[in-house]
C-alpha cells in the first residue's frame, strides 16, 4: 500500500460545524509531514499533471504551498501563491473563496493574460476554492492547462463539477463512521 493511502487510513477525523474533516499532514500540516510522503505525492503529481507549456504553478495559501513548492523545485516551473492578504500591487486580482467550513477573500498576483497555468491544491472537497480560483484566472485571461488536487473528498456537493473545469486527483476518499474510506486509490483523471 502506498504511503498516501496508508496515511489517509490512519488520519484522525474531527467534526467542525457538522463537517467531517480528516486531519492529515498534506491538508493540515499535522501530524508531521514525512519527506517520503511528500516525495511520493510530488512524483505522482508530475506523472499525472499536464505540464507541457505550463508557465506558472498557481496554488492557494496555505496548504497548497508545500506541495507546489516541491513540484516547482522538481519541474523548474515558477510558483504563484494566492494569498489571503491584499498587497495592492499592480494587477492584483481579488476572488471570494467559500468552502464547507470557511469563507475568505483571496488575492492573485503575478498571473497575466496569456499565462499558461497549472492549478494545484491539497484537497478538493466542496470545490469552492478551486472553482473560485479557476474563475478568477479565466477573468484574468490565463490559460488553465490543468487542475490537480492531491486528495478528493467525495460524498458531498462539489462546485467544480457544475463548472467548466475539472480536476485530476491522486486519491479519492470519503469519511464514513468516523474513518477515512478509500473510494478510488488512483483518483480522477
UniProtKB/Swiss-Prot annotation:
Enzyme superclass (EC): transferase
Disulfide bonds: none
GO biological process: purine ribonucleoside salvage
PROSITE patterns, per database record: PUR_PYR_PR_TRANSFER
Entry EC number(s): 2.4.2.-
Keywords on record: Purine salvage, Transferase
Keyword Signal: no
UniProt similarity note: Belongs to the purine/pyrimidine phosphoribosyltransferase family. Archaeal HPRT subfamily.
Function statement: May catalyze a purine salvage reaction, the substrate is unknown.
Protein name: HGPRTase-like protein
Taxonomic source organism: Natronomonas pharaonis (strain ATCC 35678 / DSM 2160 / CIP 103997 / JCM 8858 / NBRC 14720 / NCIMB 2260 / Gabara)
